[in-house]
Amino acid sequence: MAYRLTTRRIGMAVFGVAVVAVAIAVQARQSNAVQGAAKVRGNVPGEWRYWGGDAWSTRYSALDQINASNFGSLEVAWQWSANPLGADEYYRTTPLYANGRLFTVATTRRVAAAIDPESGETLWMWRLNEGIRWQKAPRQFAGRGLAYWSDGPNERVIVVTPGYHLAALDAKTGIPDPKFGTNGVVDLMDGLGMPLVPLAVDDSGSLVISDAAPYRQARPGEAWDPVKKIGADGTIGIDPKFGQIANSSPAIVVNDVIVVGNSSIHGYYPIRVRNIPGFIRGFDARTGKQLWKFNLVPQPGEFGAETWQNGSKIGTEGVGKNDAWGTYAADPELDLVYIPVGMPLMDEYGGHRPGNNLFGNSIVAIDVKTGQRKWHFQMVHHDIWDYDTPMSPNLLDVTINGRPRKIVAQTTKQGWVYTFDRVTGEPIWPMPETPVLQSDVPGEKTSPTQPIPSRPAPYSHQGLTEADLIDYTPAIKDSALKLAKACRMGPYFIPASLADGSAPSGLKCSWYAPGASGGVNIDGGAAADPETGMLFVGGQSGLGTIVLQKDPCSEFRYSSPRDSCGLIGALPAPPGYVKREVGSGRSVAVTQIGGVPILKPKQMGGITGYDMTTGDKKWWLPNGGVMRQVTTESPLFAGVTLPPVPAIGGQPQVINTKTLMIYGTGRSGGAGGRRGGGGGAGAAGAAPAQPANQPQLYAIDKATGQQVATVRIPQVNTAVPMTFMHKGKQYIVFAYGQGSNTGLTALTLPAAPAGSRNGGSGDRQ
């Protein structure tokens, strides 16, 4: 009996050891799998080294210390104030976390800073004095973030400044790397084949954002006037006759190559056809040497030049824009970077640029070693809707119809997800070229077809047809139809009309949906779950109108309603010209009856969850998770119970973790930046008292779209959040604020009682 007992005990002991061994082996495999997957995406488990979380721009973290059971218990760990650094339109930056430090940029100066992730104290700050190039930079805001690079012993923070310089800073000290460029800085205006000249501030007339160059070439001997802040201060830059250049998004680092693009002037109200075109360049991450340059407006003789037909001007004397002003994604294993490209100049009229205008409105896959195009796909031909591509695509490895596929999914202003094999560029689901309405504006020649994705279903409303109008009673339908027929109608890609009704249609406006803000735009975009293949799109949906009118004081035959005459760089006004009131070309028609939108409410905008293994739409929820009842005193709606609509507009800003999809409502969702936090730059402090309409962060079940928890936050988030693990604690950090009151808020779980854990397995990664 003793023997048998001993045998049993030995057996149990051996079994117990086996269980432990199996558990350790499984845990090791899971840990290795997590680390391996993160490494493939260019990240380190528990870190956030790219604007989009990783090189694939998944906005995904495998952390789950913060989960459904404790999300509502999150509390403010610290707030970091950027107030002493200057003002900003609104704070649109997503920080990075790497090797124990948090990195951000702030304000129109684009000050780079390292922050202690535990206390919120500033470790270092850096700013480049750019003189006139900063003072008159066309896109001064905080640039959405920065980039990070490390080869092991060396760590660098990569900053693109408002005045268009590229800097490599020691991540530990903030000191520019003396081996990079000149004293740590590369002048990005150099290497473009355009002459650099002394610059001077131009004060010869009124200036409206995005109009002609805000500076000119300096005159011989011209001096700087520190009181009036005009004249020349020694700043060197591209000759202003070529136009304006800037940057509005961080670079991305792929296999020791820094990939950076440019922004041109806004296309709303340009005066000149000629402006700086878009391009992508690669720089050596160690030395700053320019390795290659890819032209997004093909130069004569290059692939795609034939898509700029007779009458189009390309080259340094040609049409501007086609700039890639958004964020980028990359596949380090394939040596490919995926570039979402904007549109050519100008936004609503293209009579000066006949043709499809490559590489405008395209996703372009570029080899980071050579700068050569691997493949491209143009999502909008000859854009006249301001449908530039504003956001990095999302990369996933999924199985479709039993076949492993490496895919790239591009969200757009158009309200569609365009999905491709990221190796070959082949569409995953058909995108047939579909006939669309043609422009009747003199001189305009629109594309006869546009590619329309068959899957996934759109996340934003497109166009306006009779079936889209409210029809709760015959009288309501008649009233809505009367309003709708005042403008040109159609299913999608409806071209602009002339404000004076002189075009053949006789109509004075055209419906515009989605509008210039999308769809998705700079504030929204998608997060991807590499474990399940789900894609979570934070978008918006709406209806507007678009018109054109003659523009005698610009080089364009037509433009959105405005008065160019008298602005810097404008052509002389014609004899007898009467000054016009400045208006908007994107919202000129009535879109409501008695406060009720004429468009039927649909499950669009908000957040849409897609299964990218099938292209199916799995769920939808409104921004903020709340619908509101529409009421009106209009007698037309007497006795009609109107369907609810989302209570919060705008674009949700989404990320996802191992168990949750987490989002903030964005600028539309609450008290904005009206209340601040912290004192000096980088000061950590307690959250101030909050108003009753305090904004929240939301936790969602990724599989079902059901809200599982919320937590109140001091200020509404104004950019995409991020998350990381530091010293065994998971944090969520987001930007807040506008004007002179901006900063970062960090949330974490309360300290656990001695001997207990906060929960979840994320603290082991």
What role is predicted for each listed range?
Residues 1-7:
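N-terminal secretory signal peptides that target proteins for export/translocation
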Residues 13-23:
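Bacterial N-terminal signal peptides
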Residues 45-48, 55-56, 82-84, 97-98, ...:
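Acidic, proline/glycine-rich low-complexity intrinsically disordered segments
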Residues 48-52, 88-111, 137-165, 202, ...:
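Repeat-blade elements of multi-bladed beta-propeller folds
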